[in-house]
Amino acid sequence: MTGPRVFKRSEMVLKPAVTPTGTTAIARVVDASISREMGAGIEYLEDATIDWTITYDEVLFILEGPLTIEFDGAAHECNTGDIVWLPNGTHLKYIAKQRAAYFYAVHPVDWAAKQGLAEP
């Protein structure tokens, strides 16, 4: 675990993520090497649909929208500045018909490793 840090956008490395449709890239800035509890980063989506059941608690802050998130039988259109709470076990679908981006914070940081998965 490390002390306080500032992550400069110019130093973030975007990595393509494996998805069934569209384009997505993730810059993970807080991972298990930095925190034992939380993870955080930025994800960019463009013309992408991701169907997923999360196995962690997550908070999203929409940086660029619109981004539609379907959960609990409804479609929620999220725009710049909106905040979304997604508890562990939520089945959802992210739909970005154009470029969208969000900051995410997750707990626990090692959700994928606990399930024997590589992070997407």
Residue ranges and their predicted role:
Residues 29, 36-54, 88:
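Conserved short histidine dyad/triad with adjacent acidic residue
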Residues 77, 112, 117-119:
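Charged, glycine-enriched surface loops/patches
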Residues 51, 68, 77, 93, ...:
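General beta-strand recognition
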Residues 1-42, 119-120:
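A short, N-terminal "cap"/entry segment at the start of jelly-roll beta-barrel domains
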Residues 57, 64-66, 73, 89-91, ...:
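A generic structural motif
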Residues 44-46, 53-70:
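Short, conserved beta-strand element in jelly-roll/cupin
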Residues 72-88:
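Short acidic-glycine-tyrosine-enriched beta hairpin
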Residues 88-114:
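Ligand-binding loop in jelly-roll beta-barrel domains
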